[in-house]
Amino acid sequence: MSEITLGKYLFERLSQVNCNTVFGLPGDFNLSLLDKLYEVKGMRWAGNANELNAAYAADGYARIKGMSCIITTFGVGELSALNGIAGSYAEHVGVLHVVGVPSISSQAKQLLLHHTLGNGDFTVFHRMSANISETTAMITDIANAPAEIDRCIRTTYTTQRPVYLGLPANLVDLNVPAKLLETPIDLSLKPNDAEAEAEVVRTVVELIKDAKNPVILADACASRHDVKAETKKLMDLTQFPVYVTPMGKGAIDEQHPRYGGVYVGTLSRPEVKKAVESADLILSIGALLSDFNTGSFSYSYKTKNIVEFHSDHIKIRNATFPGVQMKFALQKLLDAIPEVVKDYKPVAVPARVPITKSTPANTPMKQEWMWNHLGNFLREGDIVIAETGTSAFGINQTTFPTDVYAIVQVLWGSIGFTVGALLGATMAAEELDPKKRVILFIGDGSLQLTVQEISTMIRWGLKPYIFVLNNNGYTIEKLIHGPHAEYNEIQGWDHLALLPTFGARNYETHRVATTGEWEKLTQDKDFQDNSKIRMIEVMLPVFDAPQNLVKQAQLTAATNAKQ
């Protein structure tokens, strides 16, 4: 019988689910495992600068390709990744965290090994990860190891949550039957309970029949749990007005004639706020009702006719249907409503915000102007990444072309996340279409947390756009508290020296301080082509911020001060 090592089995399985790049760092408990990656055609080891950045990169990759894998070493390595893994858990991103752990015999003898706490407890780090993992596995028996690997990959993909997999150093070189690879991992969702699903569909159909002014509200999990196609069909079939939340940016086509804008509670444009809150039926798809996603919980629906479609349950008014998955329920709903909506008379959606006329070329750059004009630079198929802070709020003012995907960590909000996410997303984009552009907007403060990963981009010849918004410090924190506090200040960097410092040869750097310089640069044909890595420093006033961020900061400060 043909056999392969357990380590090679893992990478063959990852290759089969199109997870072709693995992130992480080498450590003595995973070195033998990493040897096996190079035995599998088409697999790539990213080789990150540190484990936290690797976790961020795995998150960015998974958002584009459906799942990812990070490999760390026991203790010191895995713990360094946990902030990033927690963010993936919070934001519904499927990351398989493989940890190389000491051999089974070392654990049994409770040896006082390096990277331990010195107390003989080899399960403590596994237990730490359990609360931010959908499931965990610590392989102890080669006989069931392939099945456990398959289970972990399946769970990562189908639940869109991180999964922890511990692989002892002595097991990865042991053999397992190669024939197991002939049976693909089943990545399909289990069907809904037919009776519960039918009741959901019947109830929603009746609500739609009675509605005169329904709206669709697309949120984060419309993207994360793969119902973008179903959401588009629902838009096309019903012609209901459609809105997105900040976390829902990119979930629908913003060029669709029924698209009405971004709903953020009291932070919404007045006409958007009125349209959503006056609806008599709200079909909410994939909601994550966090503070920054809802304008500090300021939703003010006038109707109680709210249907929440989630990945693992559906809520209709006050009734919850556990275990009913939205993907199948939406498909059944689409089959059931053509007759119901045929006489629906479409309600007008709010008019698009017109882009202001050109300003004098020497006008200093401001956030409001930049975000409103950014759509002119974007093109179909772009991946846009916006860092926590001014970028995460400003991007809500930008109307996207068709098929633009957005990565914004609105819920977890770990500053510096997007540098690693840019690496992962760019590697994923390169595997899908080398011409696909990946564009990052990040503040000067956030960049300082994770800047090392730019060197990994250069190492792999990646060609992203990195827009550094230089407003001299942590602007979002200044707006919330301590506008002149020393702790919100940073050391200024020579940003345009970073690419050559990290060893770049084929690169461009630009500094933009006026609207004329912005327009000249972004309209340049060569600049529009992702032929090289680029860093663009955008010079902005110290306290300049999108108006929504100013308002959100006031709400957050008030929340923090409540007794």
From Swiss-Prot:
It catalyses: pyruvate + H(+) = acetaldehyde + CO2; 3-methyl-2-oxobutanoate + H(+) = 2-methylpropanal + CO2; (S)-3-methyl-2-oxopentanoate + H(+) = 2-methylbutanal + CO2; indole-3-pyruvate + H(+) = indole-3-acetaldehyde + CO2. Its EC number is 4.1.1.-, 4.1.1.43, 4.1.1.72, 4.1.1.74. It comes from the Eukaryota. GO terms for cellular component: cytoplasm; cytosol; nucleus. GO terms for molecular function: branched-chain-2-oxoacid decarboxylase activity; indolepyruvate decarboxylase activity; magnesium ion binding; phenylpyruvate decarboxylase activity; pyruvate decarboxylase activity; thiamine pyrophosphate binding. The keyword Nucleus applies. Fusel oils and acyloins are important flavor and aroma compounds in yeast-fermented products contributing to the quality of beverages and food, e.g. fusel oils in whiskey, contrary to common believe, seem to alleviate hangover. In general they are desirable at low concentrations, whereas high concentrations may spoil the product. By adjusting growth conditions and substrate their production is sought to be influenced. Due to their broad substrate tolerance pyruvate decarboxylases are important biocatalysts for chemoenzymatic syntheses, both by fermentation and in vitro, e.g. Its main location: cytoplasm. Present with 471316 molecules/cell in log phase SD medium. Belongs to the TPP enzyme family. This is Pyruvate decarboxylase isozyme 2. It comes from Saccharomyces cerevisiae (strain ATCC 204508 / S288c) (Baker's yeast).
